[in-house]
Amino acid sequence: MKYTEIMVRYGELSTKGKNRKDFIARLGGNIRKSLKDFEDVEIHPNRDRTHVTLNGTDSDAVINRLKKVFGIQNFSPMLKVEKTMEAVQAGALEMMKEQLKPGMTFKINTRRSDKEFAINTDTMNRELGGFILDNFPDNDVKMKNPDITLRVEIRSNGIFLTSEVINGAGGLPVGTAGKGMMMLSGGIDSPVAGYLGMKRGVEMEMVHFFSPPYTSEQALAKAKELSGKLAAYSGSVQFIQVPFTEIQETIKEKCPEGYLMTIQRRMMLRLVVALAKQRGGLAIFNGESLGQVASQTMESMLAINDVTTMPIIRPVVSMDKNEIIDIAKDIDTYDLSIMPFEDCCTIFAPPSPKTHPDLEKTRYFEKRIDVEGLLERSLAGVKITNIRAEENFMNQNEEVFAELL
């Protein structure tokens, strides 16, 4: 079916009162960013809905992009026809040939904003319904809960037909809740946490700790590609690569084995807070799930959080692993996440880390390292990459990977 327009309906934006205009403007901008490479597409936001004019662009490709734009409740692909009954019948016939199977029921639902159009809604419903029945004798009209509702919108600039309502991603437009810093490892949990934060309107920057030669180029490429998966929900994301080798080596050399993980996490948090202050971040996000590993007990969280007063948000904190995995599969990050490349959270991991670290002991052992000097040198080596939706990094490194095998 060659559709001419897609009508986008809003979700929670209807509750935003005086801020509604700003939310709609942000959503319009996010839709533009998502559809940037479709040069002929036009986006027209207004108070109640946004109209995406296709101008010959493949509707299926645009629909696949719109499904990942947060702030959209649902949308409908539409066919624009001339303002004559003959044109409406021809368009409806084409649409029903594709969608109305034998035995299915239907109804016509007409809205007429152009009151100068001669045919009123009742007449349109009756005449168009009769026309479809004549052409599809194996089908019946059903006014309540039909299989297909053919909607007819009579506007000043034409008549628009649609019979599909496609669910959107819901949530709030990315950017309406401010900026957050996502501590992105290569695992299953942190991409899901990033996705959930973005769904609540957070513009997320991905912070990844990289420890060569202990972590490989494959691990870095995997983290970048995971960021590309998440960028599909915002158009693009900033990927911040933070060198962490010296810090890990120093902690391993000077601190007790049981406290390695706790002190490493404190240093990570300090670095992310510093980046947030530089870049306008309002909160730190991570993929911690309570009790899942040693660093995710409440005692560990208390000892780690001690280094900052900035909010730390854990979107998956109360989820079971299977719940997190289900979301990871839905957003297409799971297969990437389980690729067996070590990240900096797994190297130097002690066999028996403290699950209930003492805060005072943590502070005492941490005094053995030059915290400020280590932070300064790490921040000096930060690299930032703008990553577009679904951008591929694993294939770019195929030759490097082959040499390592």
UniProtKB/Swiss-Prot annotation:
Keywords: ATP-binding, Cytoplasm, Nucleotide-binding, RNA-binding, Thiamine biosynthesis, Transferase, tRNA-binding
Catalytic activity: [ThiI sulfur-carrier protein]-S-sulfanyl-L-cysteine + a uridine in tRNA + 2 reduced [2Fe-2S]-[ferredoxin] + ATP + H(+) = [ThiI sulfur-carrier protein]-L-cysteine + a 4-thiouridine in tRNA + 2 oxidized [2Fe-2S]-[ferredoxin] + AMP + diphosphate; [ThiS sulfur-carrier protein]-C-terminal Gly-Gly-AMP + S-sulfanyl-L-cysteinyl-[cysteine desulfurase] + AH2 = [ThiS sulfur-carrier protein]-C-terminal-Gly-aminoethanethioate + L-cysteinyl-[cysteine desulfurase] + A + AMP + 2 H(+)
Pfam families given in the database record: ThiI, ThiI_fer, THUMP
CDD domains per record: PPase_ThiI, THUMP_ThiI
Domain THUMP: 60-165
Subcellular location: Cytoplasm
One Gene Ontology term from the biological process aspect of the record: thiamine diphosphate biosynthetic process
Enzyme Commission (EC) number: 2.8.1.4
Molecular function terms, GO-annotated: ATP binding; CCA tRNA nucleotidyltransferase activity; tRNA binding; tRNA-uracil-4 sulfurtransferase activity
Protein task: Catalyzes the ATP-dependent transfer of a sulfur to tRNA to produce 4-thiouridine in position 8 of tRNAs, which functions as a near-UV photosensor. Also catalyzes the transfer of sulfur to the sulfur carrier protein ThiS, forming ThiS-thiocarboxylate. This is a step in the synthesis of thiazole, in the thiamine biosynthesis pathway. The sulfur is donated as persulfide by IscS.
Listed name of the protein: Probable tRNA sulfurtransferase
Native species: Pediococcus pentosaceus (strain ATCC 25745 / CCUG 21536 / LMG 10740 / 183-1w)
Lineage of producing organism: Bacteria, Bacillati, Bacillota, Bacilli, Lactobacillales
